[in-house]
A protein has these predicted regions:
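Extended, charged coiled-coil "arm/hinge" scaffolds of SMC/Rad50-like chromosome-maintenance ATPases
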Residues: 158-185
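All-alpha helical catalytic cores of prenyl diphosphate-utilizing isoprenoid enzymes
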Residues: 124, 173-174, 234
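An accessory alpha-helical subdomain
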Residues: 188-191
Length: 244
């Protein structure tokens, strides 16, 4: 993607992220995302405007779409997944004998690290199934940006061990053995960590589009202003959202 060069004075003049008199700034309008990572992505969209005409139109189309789905997981679940994936304790390849040898110890003694691993693995499995369903059920008339995201989900799931996880946990509620949890944990936090980050980015994209759509409806903003390829244009009736 290509971006417009924007200096600090322009940000200040437009009151993008702060104002001299502690008045409302533009980002505050769009900061009510459902997730922390969604909020960071929204800030990125606002701070780094695109110069890529095709990508601008894709974003416009996605924000304007009235059929944007609910987020597939709630904020607490997504925060826990992020915490789990960033957790660096006890990352090791699974071994049947080691998994079996620690079963009794894990039953008798509470282990906070084991709790993070077990819940993290189960939430990631839930995430994979939710994304698989979303990608399969996406409407044919969905915006191009959503279609590209669904295609990325399908490519990642079908082209890696994550697809095998989906097949092996098709019931989702099936009880996982200690060895299976250890095996998936190494896969999620090591082997396929970057793939999972890419999958999570789809949810944050949905969050940003849903938030921008909601604000546009509430404030009667135009979601799809006309975009032209040249500098030969004029605009009338445009004001800063906080100009009274």
């Amino acid at each position: 993607m290509t971006y417009l060069d924007t200096d600090k004075q322009t940000y200040a003049d437009l009151s993008i992220t702060e104002t001299a008199n502690n008045e409302q700034f533009l980002f505050s309008l769009f900061s009510r995302t459902e997730t922390k990572e969604g909020k960071s992505l929204m800030m990125n969209w606002i701070m780094y405007p695109l110069s890529d005409l095709d990508m601008i139109r894709k974003r416009q189309e996605a924000v304007a779409w009235d059929a944007l789905p609910e987020l597939l997981l709630n904020e607490e679940e997504l925060d826990f997944i992020e915490y789990y994936l960033a957790y660096r304790d006890q990352i090791r390849e699974a071994h049947v004998l080691l998994s079996c040898a620690t079963v009794i110890d894990r039953l008798l003694r509470y282990d906070s690290t084991r709790y993070v691993i077990c819940r993290g693995v189960k939430l990631v499995i839930h995430l994979l199934h939710c994304l698989e369903r979303w990608a399969k059920e996406l409407d044919e008339d969905a915006p191009q940006l959503m279609k590209e995201s669904a295609r990325m989900v399908n490519d990642i799931l079908s082209g890696s061990e994550l697809g095998e996880v989906l097949e092996q946990t098709s019931g989702e509620e099936r009880r996982l053995s200690n060895y299976t949890i250890d095996k998936y944990d190494y896969l999620f936090r090591c082997t396929r960590l970057l793939s999972l980050k890419e999958l999570l980015s789809v949810l944050y994209l949905l969050d940003v589009c849903r938030t921008a759509h909601r604000v546009a409806k509430e404030k009667n903003f135009c979601c799809t202003p006309k975009v032209v390829e040249t500098m030969d244009f004029s605009v009338e009736g445009v004001v800063h959202p906080f100009v009274k």
